[in-house]
Curated annotation (Swiss-Prot):
Signal peptide: none annotated. GO terms for biological process: translation. This is Small ribosomal subunit protein uS7. CDD domains: uS7_Bacteria. NCBIfam families: rpsG_bact (TIGR01029). GO terms for molecular function: rRNA binding; structural constituent of ribosome; tRNA binding. GO terms for cellular component: small ribosomal subunit. It holds the Pfam family Ribosomal_S7. Keywords: Ribonucleoprotein, Ribosomal protein, RNA-binding, rRNA-binding, tRNA-binding. Part of the 30S ribosomal subunit. Contacts proteins S9 and S11. InterPro entries: Ribosomal_uS7 (IPR000235), Ribosomal_uS7_bac/org-type (IPR005717), Ribosomal_uS7_CS (IPR020606), Ribosomal_uS7_dom (IPR023798), Ribosomal_uS7_dom_sf (IPR036823).
Length: 155
């Protein structure tokens, strides 16, 4: 057990859009501390989004994240030798974090093109409520719905 609650670190906004959510996406895309590379990927993806949708990439991205955010998830809870998957509501910071993680994972799973293209396609897909990240959210909600009987084990 922690002596005190871990402090929530404030992420500084990104240099181009001045947006904290974009900065968080850059941090999720980043590997081995290579932030400049991650920024090139994200800003490149935003340029592709601008070309393909003819809309503001920031608005498309924000809506995509909103579409992917899960409302419920299941957490294991041990009760008398049995482990139940208990559905619980997801807190707002975790919703955002999961949405960004799922978008980046889905983009990485796409094969055969540069990362900026894959990321742009995944964000556009999420904006249109399709794609792997949306499927992941729906699977999570389906799991929560299937285990609704154990909701009274919440803590």
């Amino acid at each position: 057990m922690r002596r005190r609650r871990a402090e929530i670190r404030q992420v500084p906004p990104d240099p181009v859009y001045g947006d904290v959510l974009v900065a968080k996406l850059i941090n999720k895309v980043m590997w081995d501390g290579k932030k400049t590379t991650a920024q090139k990927i994200v800003y490149g993806a935003f340029d592709i989004i601008r070309e393909k949708t003819k809309k503001d990439p920031l608005e498309v991205f924000r809506q995509a994240v909103e579409n992917v955010k899960p409302v419920l998830e299941v957490r294991p809870r041990r009760v008398g030798g049995a482990t139940y998957q208990v559905p619980i509501e997801v807190q707002e910071p975790r919703r955002t974090s999961l949405a960004l993680r799922w978008i980046v994972e889905a983009a990485r799973a796409r094969k055969g093109r540069p990362m900026k293209e894959k990321l742009a396609e995944e964000i556009i897909a999420a904006y249109n409520n399709t794609g792997t990240a949306i499927k992941k959210k729906e699977d999570t909600h389906r799991m929560a719905e299937a285990n609704r009987a154990f909701a009274h084990y919440r803590w």
